[in-house]
Curated annotation (Swiss-Prot):
The gene is miaA. Keywords: ATP-binding, Magnesium, Nucleotide-binding, Transferase, tRNA processing. ATP binds at residues 12-19. Catalyzes the transfer of a dimethylallyl group onto the adenine at position 37 in tRNAs that read codons beginning with uridine, leading to the formation of N6-(dimethylallyl)adenosine (i(6)A). It comes from Coxiella burnetii (strain RSA 493 / Nine Mile phase I). One of its GO terms (biological process) is tRNA modification. Belongs to the IPP transferase family. Signal peptide: none annotated. This is tRNA dimethylallyltransferase. Its cofactor is Mg(2+). It catalyses: adenosine(37) in tRNA + dimethylallyl diphosphate = N(6)-dimethylallyladenosine(37) in tRNA + diphosphate. One of its GO terms (molecular function) is ATP binding. The record marks 103, 125 as: Interaction with substrate tRNA.
Amino acid sequence: MNKNPFIVCLMGPTASGKTDLAIALARKLPFEIISVDSAMVYRGLDIGTAKPNEEELQLTSHRLINICDPSFPYSAGQFYKDALSEIKTIEIRNRTPLLVGGTMLYFHILEQGFSDLPTADETVRKKIQEEAAQHGWAKIHERLNAIDPKSAARINPNDAQRIQRAFEVYETTGQPLSSYQSLKRFKALPYQFINLILAPENRSWLHQRIEKRFDQMLKNNFLEEVRQLYNRGDLNSDLPAIRTVGYRQVWKYLSGEYDYETMRHKAIAATRQLAKRQLTWLRRWPDAKWFNSEDKDLISQVVDYLKGIGM
């Protein structure tokens, strides 16, 4: 094994163009791609996760895609073990791992290990407190139960401090507090991480792209994809796979809870909220080089940067 070997991490909010850039980079540099996405691990979750298609996968293979059934609650701890195994395999092949995705908790435990829970910014904290003042902490506890039933079961509906902390973690990271409980034994990996962040400078560009992408997913038979999962009979809305943004809303449409327009509106809104949480975390990421998704010469910019640091 090389001394302090490189790992390149390509991070960014959903719909920022990470997959296209990763494939382009892997065709120009000695990279092998590892997906860092908590939804792409599931077989049958293809259209709604914007998973690389068969043609793209033939051009450039992606590791940690389609590795488990949607009935399996894949965890951050499992990702840590799987990613480490794939990284070592790529090293043996004298290639460089290119980790690509938007599940920030997964990147975090690889690079920094796990010690303390992430802190919330003041805007998030204030928003939760204002909602509690308006609706009461018991109502906030009900909402917590919808996104993190394990934590909600452990927290009294009147325990404002613990409810707020659980909500802060989710709003800041997009991951439930309960997902952190088993991570304390994981240590940062002994590699030199090159962090690249891909995001647009214009937020409206991302919002428009999210809306257009979801509408295209609907045209590409996303409803039928979720219907096949729904009709299996062994899946439910509490599973991590079905709680994935987009799938959760279509599931509620199929169950009759939402009409079509409500489903579409809520799915787009939830995806934008996901992007916001991802950007909140990315802005705090140490030692990262930012690139603008909107730049026409994006690929050459990134290649030049990587070659300039010795890749």
